[in-house]
Structure formats: structure tokens, C-alpha cells
Amino acid sequence: MSHVAVENVLNLDQQFAGLDLNSADAESGVAGTKGRYIPPHLRNKEASRNDSNWDSGRGGNGYINGMQDDRDGRMNGYDRGGYGSRGTGRSDRGFYDRENSGWNSGRDKDAYSSFGSRGDRGKGSLFNERGSGSRRTDDRRQDGFDGMGNRSDKSGFGRFDRGNSRWSDDRNDEDDWSKPLAPNDRVEQELFSGSNTGINFEKYDDIPVEATGSNCPPHIESFHDVTMGEIIMGNIQLTRYTRPTPVQKHAIPIIIEKRDLMACAQTGSGKTAAFLLPILSQIYADGPGDAMKHLQENGRYGRRKQFPLSLVLAPTRELAVQIYEEARKFAYRSRVRPCVVYGGADIGQQIRDLERGCHLLVATPGRLVDMMERGKIGLDFCKYLVLDEADRMLDMGFEPQIRRIVEQDTMPPKGVRQTMMFSATFPKEIQILARDFLDEYIFLAVGRVGSTSENITQKVVWVEEMDKRSFLLDLLNATGKDSLTLVFVETKKGADALEDFLYHEGYACTSIHGDRSQRDREEALHQFRSGKSPILVATAVAARGLDISNVKHVINFDLPSDIEEYVHRIGRTGRVGNLGLATSFFNEKNINITKDLLDLLVEAKQEVPSWLENMAYEQHHKSSSRGRSKSRFSGGFGAKDYRQSSGAGSSFGSSRGGRSSGHGGSRGFGGGYGGFYNSDGYGGNYGGSSQVDWWGN
């Protein structure tokens, strides 16, 4: 019995010896080093594995480190889904093959070897995402290849970023952010398929531009007049921007020269690209700087704080997402990764997105403060600060949060960082804020400050409250079926009620206001933009910054209580050189804005109804005894750089003799709806005999 056992042991020893399991030299080449078990199906491949680069890009020590052993009960590299999510079963959707420079949908190709694993931490794997099989709620058109970070890249400055969605083929150029990465037809189609140009640029260029400040850089006439690098110029071409708008002609060289800027331009004038283009071009030229070194030394996955190089603050989530989408376009084929955070969305998902890396952050003030207090965002290395729609942020009560972000945290002080403020209006309060935030800034006024575009024909109609719905139906019936109409109301309840009324009247419509979920708001905007619901009922939440092209008609069903809100509402039409119409329902509830509305109509060379002139005259006499301040639109404080006194330096970027007259700027309009503008108030007859219709045709 024992003899048989001993014999069996000897036979086993002989069998193990035959398998050469204990030969350290055979495997490691180092005497005295204990060998490791090699599965039978891999023994013949071991010698040639390094020559074939099977584990290229995985940064591991061979098969065991490059790919997780199934014995630990976790998914291995082949089980991970094509979007980096574990076990999602999407691995056959296609991967980018670095060696073949194309999309590779084969399961047995080396594209899998670029997926990192537990053994890759700190070894520079190129593509990996932890637990993100679901798409982010705010990346509506984003796919899994569009810029995900990786676990091993603690800094977030990896070679694969959301804004560019590209592999970096040349590792020697890894630190050169100015060189574009490889193109990708699919992402290119996704980002640049829409139209971005207006139809009336010849007249649009006639708008005068005034730049005030010391040593103001000369303006440009073409994007080629200033050096912005290969990446930016390529993306400008893809975006089909043929030439800069007036605000871009002046703002881009000012920002390139690293000057602070306070710019006032009409809505829809290209303000977003005016600051994104020069900021991104400087980031590409300078690289990440100290931010990457700091993150590499101190970052830990899941707990690290992100340090964006640029911060853009916006008042609403819609505007923040819109700026973010533009940033994605201009960050295409670069190493810069844009991110966006805003209230009303899952903060956990936004934190996970930030942890994958963030170089340019677009945020609403409230959510950014939340992220900073959670230790997820640090502004220590922020070189560029942008306040977009600054007056609107103050109107919404964000000044404490803005001052907390800019003055009471770790953001570099003015003079060290570069700060830009953009808005359609700049009343005195905003200019005082600019004095605190900006350093030796240049004041840029495109057109008249606080004015409206002459591409917009403005009509003010006296309509009693009980007649508003009937009058609205008449306007909608006179509008072409393919025309987009934006109807503004004052309250959320009013928006829902009006949408319900129009729906039961047979009109395809949708609505958007603050009580709607983010998903509902995005869906409503999509339905409106696509023309499926050509009527959008909205509160002021949609009035600022939304770039909805081809809006033919804006209707103020309820006029706002202040004239600046009126400017922003009607600015939704006539954008970037297009022509539009704005109709406002006026009655005794709106007397408080009579004088300002009259001044605005006169300034924009619009026809003024006689009843409005009479009301403004009466209102002026009533308020004179109370010492009423000068009108917002009568050339007062907000209409120029308040630093100007006698002899202040200024330069005029355009010597043309004034703005274009736009669409029907001074023509009569008593037309298809009869005489609305007689002194008796609402003029009744919808079937006027004039040959000029409501649209000025």
C-alpha cells in the first residue's frame, strides 16, 4: 500500500518535471527565481508575445497583469463592454485600432489590448472607464467613444478625451497639446452636421463697434489674421464659419493678447465662439502646465479633485449645455476635455464625469459651489474665467455665489488670471462688478449697448387680457406652418395653461419652464428645433442665451416687468444676421415699462404707436415729481464705458456710417390686421385693407 503511494508520488514528480513547471530559468531567465504556472494553451506563445506587442498599451507585466485572471471572480478584458462598462455585452460595437488607423469590429483584434485593468493603474493605459455603461444625461448626442477618461490616468490629462475622441498615435508628442490628434468621421459628423451661419451678414457687418481702453489691439477681418493654431483653424472650417462676426472681430484679438474684457453685444452675435476660440487656442499652445503635475502627484481615483484650466459661468442649465456643446466642437482632435455641471441633474453622474478629467468647465454658479464644497473642483490653476450673461446671473440672485467662487476660494486673483464678461446689457451694477473682477480691461460695445437688432421688426399691440388668446390664434394662423414661433408668458402655471389651450385648438406645441425636469426641457427644445412642435411656450428660463436658429416670430403674450428682459426675449429671433418679427401684447398691466419701451423702439428705428407715445408722456409727468431716474435707453450710464470722462482713449473698430435698417425697420405697418396703433388703443379690425401684411410683405 505504502509502496504504491510512493510509486505514485514518483510518477507525479516525473510528470511535473516533464511539464518543466519548476524551471525558473526557462521562463524568467534569472537563476534562483521561482517560476510561475503557464497554462498549456499559452506555453508556445510565451516566447513570441513581446515581439507581437499583444499587450501593447496595457502597461502590464505580461498576460497576468495586462488582463485580469478569471480566477479572482472578476470580468477579464474580453468581458468588458465596448463602452468601458463591465460586462455590458457591447464589445462587438467596434473599437478604434491604433495600428490600422480605423474602426475595428473584430473580436479577436488587438484593439482589446488597449483596455486597462487592475494591473494597469499608474502605467498609462489609454482607454478605460469605470462603471459608466450608461450615457450621461447632459450629453445628448454623445457616444461612448467621445472622450472618456481612464483609471490609470490620475490627472485626467489622458490621451483620449471627450472633446476630441481620438487616440494619440505619436507618444513622443504626448506633451505637445498644439498638435491635432487623428480625425474620426463618425464624431465629426455628430459634432458638425448642423448649420451655423446667418443669411444677412452684409448688413450685419455694418454695426458700429466701439472699444474703450488703453492699448487696445487692432481688430481682425478674417480668422486667418490672428494665430490660433492648427486645431482651432481646422475646427473653424468644420463649423463652416466663413468670417468672424463683429464681436468676434474685436474680442478674439483682445483675448489672444491676454487682456481682460467686458463685452456688450446683442444676443445671437457669436459671443460664445468669441471667447471659446481664443481661450482654447491658448490652452493648446501652453499645455496643461502645473495642473497636470499637481494632479499626478496628489490625485487618487475616486477621490481626486479636478483643477480646470478654464471656467465658464452661465445663469441657466440650458445655456451651460449650449456652451458645452460648442466647446466640444472646438476641442475636437485636441487633448482638452470639456465638462458641464448644473443643477437639476444627477450630481453623482456629474461627479463621475468630472473624475475622468476636466480642463474646461462650464457651470451654473450654484452647482459649482456645491462641487467645490464636496472637494471635487479646485480653481487653483484656473487661467481663464468667463462670466456669460453676467447681468442675468445678478438678476437671478447669483452674486453671492459668484463672489464666493471668484474672491473667497483658491482662484488666482485678477491680474494673474484672465477674466472676460459677456452680456447683451451692462447696467451700472454690472460695471461695478467688472471693476472688482477685471484688471485694466477693455470695454467692447458692439452696436448700441442695451439695444436690439434692427434685423428684428418690433410691433406693440394693445390687447386686453380677455382677448389675448383669440389674438394669439389669429397670429398663429397668419404664420407659415414651417415657421418657428416662440411665445413668452410670465408664470409657469400660465405656460402650462396656454400650452393646453393651444393643444386643444389643434396646434402642435410644447412648453418649457423651471418646474419641468431636465429631461422634459431637453425633449421640448428638441421637438421645437426639429419643427415637430413649431410653437414653444416658455417662461424667462428660455429667454437667455438659447441658440435656437430660424425662430421667425417671438410673441410676448405677457410682457416682462423690466425692459432688459424684453431685450433678451425678442433676441431669440433675428439671430446672427437672420430676419425676424417680435410682437408684444400691451395693456394697462404694463404701464411701468412704457417709457423704456418707447425709447427702445425709437432707438431701433421702429414705428411707435401713437397711444404708446401718449402713455409715455403721461407717465413722464407723473414720475417727474418723484425724481425718476434717466431712462435705461436714453444714453445714460449703461450705454458707455463708465470709466470714460473727458479725453478717455477709445478706438472705433468700424468707421461705417451706422447700422443697417434691417427688416422693415421704418416701414408702416397698419396692414393685414388693421389699425392697431391708433390713439384709441386696440384698433379692432383684423381684415385691414392695406397691401402690406403683418410680416411687412
Swiss-Prot record:
Record-listed E.C. numbers: 3.6.4.13
Biased composition (Basic residues): 622-631
Principal place of residence: membrane
Renumbered residue ranges of the record's region Disordered: 27-189, 619-666
PROSITE patterns: DEAD_ATP_HELICASE (PS00039), HELICASE_ATP_BIND_1 (PS51192), HELICASE_CTER (PS51194), Q_MOTIF (PS51195)
Gly residues: compositionally biased ranges: 655-666
Coiled-coil regions listed: none
PANTHER family: ATP-DEPENDENT RNA HELICASE DBP3
Family membership noted in the UniProt record: Belongs to the DEAD box helicase family. DDX3/DED1 subfamily.
The name this protein goes by in its record: Putative ATP-dependent RNA helicase an3
